[in-house]
Regions:
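Glycine-rich flexible loops
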Residues: 1-240
Length: 240
């Protein structure tokens, strides 16, 4: 099979659309945030990866800043500029998760401040939506572990999560498509802000924030597919 890779303008436009959406939400501060989209290719078993090259931000990028890489290796298949170090993590996720076709990585202010305060070790669940949207528990990577330069540890956790929090660093969300990865990012960062607001209000009023129980959360994960992609209008959270 031919290994020739041609640029698909539709995939490029989709990447650019979500770069604009992510930037509009204030997630982008520098060159290190990124989006990766997998596209099928007959010459590459894992497909190929569309992404932004290094040296500029998602906010600044245009179609000419899209490069295409191999997935098992960092080889550039289209374009002539290098990707940033974070692309290593996204490539490894795509290699290990054939069900995933998009990743989104940002350095979110609220997340970095929330964990940087030293007061919290996890994002707790207040709302009904986060577990449904994420579909699986959040995985937390300790601040001293660099899974971008050394991806060997990714295989140990990536099957059991759709959202990776790199403590002191950023968030990477996974999706069957870029829309799903984007919704997961927004749900996770919203829940962090809700945690902060609930804790501050509870402190001011002398009350306790009302977080969901583990049993409730596990039930939401179990029915996530039925809620987000319903096949019927009623009795959605009933076992078939």
């Amino acid at each position: 099979m031919s290994g020739e890779v041609r640029f698909d303008p539709e995939v490029g436009r989709q990447l650019l659309k979500y770069a604009r959406l992510v930037s509009a939400r204030g997630y982008v501060h520098n060159t290190l945030g990124n989006i990766v989209l997998r596209a099928p290719h007959p010459g590459y078993a894992h497909g190929v990866a569309y992404t932004k090259h290094a040296e500029l931000s998602l906010e600044e990028m245009e179609l000419e800043n899209v490069v295409i890489t191999d997935i098992p290796s960092s080889r550039i298949l289209y374009g002539n500029k290098m990707t940033s170090i974070g692309h290593n993590l996204s490539r490894e996720i795509l290699r290990l998760r054939p069900d995933i076709h998009a990743t989104l990585h940002v350095h979110d202010d609220a997340m970095i401040a929330y964990f940087g305060s030293g007061a919290f070790s996890e994002v707790r669940t207040l709302s009904l939506d986060m577990p449904f949207v994420l579909g699986k528990p959040i995985h937390y990577v300790p601040g001293h572990v660099d899974v971008e330069s050394d991806v060997s540890g990714v295989k140990d956790f990536i099957q059991d999560t759709n959202s990776v929090v790199l403590l002191g660093h950023g968030i990477t969300t996974l999706g069957r498509n870029i829309s799903e990865a984007y919704h997961r990012l927004n749900s996770l960062t919203s829940e962090i802000r809700r945690n902060v607001a609930a804790e501050l209000l509870a402190l001011a009023k002398g009350s306790t924030a009302l977080y969901r129980s583990q049993a409730e959360i596990e039930s939401m994960y179990r029915f996530a597919e039925s809620i987000i992609y319903p096949k019927r209008a009623d009795h959605v959270m009933h076992e078939d």
